[in-house]
Structure formats: C-alpha cells, structure tokens
Amino acid sequence: MRIGLISDTHDRLPTINAALTLFQQLDIDTLLHPGDIIAPFAAKPLAAFPGTVYVTYGNNDGERLGLSKVLPQIKDGPLHVELGGKRILLHHFRDWCRTADVALADIIVTGHTHEVTIERVEDKLFVNPGECCGWVTGRCTVAILDLDAEHVEVLEIPA
C-alpha cells in the first residue's frame, strides 16, 4: 500500500492543487497531512480529494472552527492510524510526540520544520515530507510512503 504525505501547505493553493493532482495520477487514495493548512479556503481541495485524508492541526492553524467545518476529520495530534498493517502516528511537530505514543507506532509522520527528514531510529521510521508551500526552503515537496517496504520517495512540486 502506498500513501501520500503532504505537510505545511500554508494556503498556497497552486502547490496544494498540483500535489493533489500528482497523488491522483499516481493512484494514491490515502493522504496524511500533519498540519499547517492555515485557512479554511486552503482546506477545500483536501476535502475534495477523492480518497481518505487524515489530518492534524499544526501550530499555525488558528482558525480551527473554520478548518473543522471544511475538514470534519481534522484532529489535535497525536493521531494514531493503522494502514496496511502498519501503526502510524501523525503529529505536527516531532518534538511534541510523547514517548508512549511513539512506542505504539511503526511509522511517525510529522511536519513543522519544513525540512524533508527520513530517519530510522531503532525499529521506528520517522518521516517529514517537507513543505508543500515552498515558502521557507524554496522547495515544494510531498512524499509517497510505501508501507510494505517502509520506503519513502520525496517528490518536488513545481512552484
């Protein structure tokens, strides 16, 4: 099973739409977004995605009521999800992940830093797909996570 990872979209509709189109072209039907969508208008393309979207709030998601109206499934992290036989922990910032939550997960997906990170620590895979918005690093990135192989492919979206 392959799932899409997208984070820190920060209201940048062109790259959000490009990422979602790419995921559909690659037959990805499940997305994980660990937060920082920002405004409800930027959540609308995620709500329209023709698959399942798991999403947590980020530190810049101030308009929580509006976001929850567009994406009723949005949650405070940590969010535990089981997909393809893997236990996944979704949270905006890695440093906010409690040891007890990490212990329950095989894969930990975070955002916040805007930097791509793929790191194995003992038997845990930590992944940050970077920033879809490209505002901080100049790179608009998303990732594909192959759950069977626990392999991550980072993809760059044209700005």
Identify the function of each model-found stretch.
Residues R2-H10, R87-H92, L125-G130, V154:
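Active-site-proximal beta-strand elements of phosphoester/diester hydrolases
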Residues Q25, G77-G84, A103, R120-E122, ...:
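Binuclear metal-dependent phosphoesterase catalytic core
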Residues P78-E119:
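Internal catalytic-core helix/loop-beta-alpha segment
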Residues H10-T15, I38-F41, N60-G66, D95-T99, ...:
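Active-site environment of divalent metal-dependent phosphoester hydrolases
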Residues R2-L83:
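Core catalytic region of metal-dependent phosphoesterases/phosphodiesterases
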Residues L32, Y54, I107-V109, L125-V127, ...:
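Hydrophobic/aromatic beta-strand patches that form the interior of the parallel beta-sheet core
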